Amino acid sequence: MIFGIGTDICDIRRLRATYARRGERFAEKVLGPQELEVFRYRLAKVEARGLSYLATRFSAKEAFSKAIGTGMRTPMSWRACQILNARSGKPEIRLHGPLAAWFEAQGLRAHVSVTDETDYAASFVVVETQET
């Protein structure tokens, strides 16, 4: 059964301006350790690809926080939620710490879809209760 649905759209131009002002500190606030590795790799190759990656992760975390109904409040935090790609390329939500414990205790499962174009990144998250 559906527990919650969340969606978010991020203006990559605004994110680029924030990154220009705050630099790496902004990425370190939003991204978890594995996401930071991917971000740095993509940014070094093509800056636009790195910023698009950061925008899709920002958007997906916002959408996830809406789907679980907490917004960006405890137990949700930027770094406790990572959006990582499976070998197939499918994005997956991986949770850590108190957020992971809370999510598991609720018996929830999440699905995420991300997309980006030149100026925008968007995400859609569906959280469902696991059948018992």
Curated annotation (Swiss-Prot):
Role according to the record: Transfers the 4'-phosphopantetheine moiety from coenzyme A to a Ser of acyl-carrier-protein.
GO terms for cellular component: cytoplasm
Needed cofactors: Mg(2+)
Enzyme Commission numbers on file: 2.7.8.7
Keywords linked to the UniProt accession: Cytoplasm, Fatty acid biosynthesis, Fatty acid metabolism, Lipid biosynthesis, Lipid metabolism, Magnesium, Metal-binding, Transferase
Transport among keywords: no
Listed name of the protein: Holo-[acyl-carrier-protein] synthase
Localisation: Cytoplasm
NCBIfam families in alphabetical order: acpS (TIGR00516), pantethn_trn (TIGR00556)
Family per record: Belongs to the P-Pant transferase superfamily. AcpS family.
Enzyme class: transferase
InterPro entries cross-referenced by the UniProt entry: 4-PPantetheinyl_Trfase_dom, 4-PPantetheinyl_Trfase_dom_sf, ACPS, Ppantetheine-prot_Trfase_dom
Binding positions for Mg(2+) per the UniProt entry: 8, 62
